[in-house]
Amino acid sequence: MIVQMYGVSWCPDCRAARKFLDSYGIEYTEIDVEGDPAASAEVVRRVGKRAVPQLVIDGEWFQPYKPGRGLLVDELHERLGIPRA
């Protein structure tokens, strides 16, 4: 499985997504959209706005956080194939 996370260092939602991935030992490549204009443009092209965090799991884009709902833990478990405890 190839996982990429588009985010920024100061974003609390990005920190929550990083913590989730790290807690399950999921390897991922982090792409800083603030320091990489091409990456920022790619996020806008794919999702219509500069919204982070964004995960790309085996080529499929997914926003793991929704305002008012927080980190989408159940969906992350499902998409990453992590069994629920």
Q: Where are the predicted features?
A:
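Local sequence-structure signature of Cys/Sec-based thiol-disulfide redox active-site neighborhoods
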Residues: 1-27
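Rhodanese-like catalytic fold shared by cysteine-dependent sulfurtransferases
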Residues: 45-46, 82
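Non-catalytic, surface beta->alpha helical segment in thiol-disulfide oxidoreductase systems
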Residues: 57-85
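Nucleotide phosphate-binding site architecture
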Residues: 12, 34, 63
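Structural micro-motif
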Residues: 47-57
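Thiol-based oxidoreductase modules, predominantly thioredoxin-like and allied folds used
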Residues: 26-40, 49
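Positions that flank functional sites
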Residues: 36, 43, 59
